[in-house]
C-alpha cells in the first residue's frame, strides 16, 4: 500500500504536469497493490487543482472534487483516516516551514504501515530521522 503525496496525486490527475508520465508508469505497475489518499493529500489536491498560478489548466472547486471522486473510484484505493498532530512525539523534527506537511505525511504513513510516494527528495531526507518510515522517491526516467 502506498500513500501518494500531493504532488504525486496532482501529477496522476493532470497530463500537463511535468511528472505525469512517470507517475502513470508507477501507478500502472503498483496500483493493484493498493494506493491511498488522506485528508491532507485530498485537500492539497483540490487546492492545487484550482490554483491557476500552479496549474495552468486550473478548474473550479466542484470540478476538482469530481476529479478526486473519480480518482478514488480507481481500483486499489483506500482512504487513510488521519490522527496525526504535529506535537506528537513520533513526528520527525521539523526545522523549516517546507517540512511541515512532509513530516505530517511521513508520520501518517509510518503509523498506517504504508510507504509514502513522492517526487520530493527532501521528504526522503526527512524520513531518515525515522528509519522505519518507508518512502518511495520517484525519479524521472
From Swiss-Prot:
Subcellular location, principal: secreted
Keyword annotations from UniProtKB, A to Z: Hydrolase, Magnesium, Metal-binding, Nuclease, Secreted, Toxin-antitoxin system
Cofactor entry: Mg(2+)
Keyword set includes ATP-binding: no
InterPro entries per the UniProt record, alphabetical: Mtu_PIN (IPR006226), PIN-like_dom_sf (IPR029060), PIN_dom (IPR002716), VapC_family (IPR022907)
Top-level EC class: hydrolase
E.C. number(s) listed in UniProt: 3.1.-.-
GO biological process terms held by the UniProt record: negative regulation of growth
MF (Gene Ontology): magnesium ion binding; RNA nuclease activity
Pfam families per record: PIN
Protein's UniProt keywords contain Magnesium: yes
Residues where Mg(2+) binds: 5, 102
Entry GO terms, CC: extracellular region
Compartment(s) of residence: Secreted
Protein family according to the UniProt entry: Belongs to the PINc/VapC protein family.
Task of the protein: Toxic component of a type II toxin-antitoxin (TA) system. An RNase. Its cognate antitoxin is VapB38.
Protein name: Ribonuclease VapC38
Organism listed in the record: Mycobacterium tuberculosis (strain ATCC 25618 / H37Rv)
Amino acid at each position: 500500500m502506498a500513500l501518494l503525496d500531493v504532488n504525486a496525486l496532482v501529477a496522476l490527475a493532470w497530463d500537463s504536469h511535468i511528472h505525469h508520465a512517470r507517475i502513470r508508469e508507477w501507478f500502472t505497475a503498483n496500483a493493484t497493490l493498493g494506493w491511498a489518499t488522506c485528508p491532507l493529500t485530498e485537500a492539497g489536491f483540490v487546492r492545487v487543482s484550482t490554483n491557476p498560478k500552479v496549474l495552468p489548466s486550473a478548474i473550479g472547486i466542484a470540478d476538482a472534487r469530481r476529479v478526486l471522486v473519480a480518482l478514488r473510484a480507481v481500483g486499489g484505493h483506500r482512504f487513510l483516516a488521519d490522527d496525526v498532530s504535529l506535537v506528537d512525539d513520533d513526528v520527525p523534527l521539523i526545522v523549516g516551514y517546507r517540512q511541515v506537511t512532509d513530516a505530517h505525511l511521513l508520520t501518517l504513513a509510518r503509523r498506517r504501515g504504508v510507504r509514502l510516494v513522492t517526487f520530493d527528495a527532501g521528504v526522503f531526507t526527512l524520513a531518515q530521522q525515522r528509519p522505519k518510515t518507508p518512502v518511495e522517491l520517484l525519479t524521472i526516467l
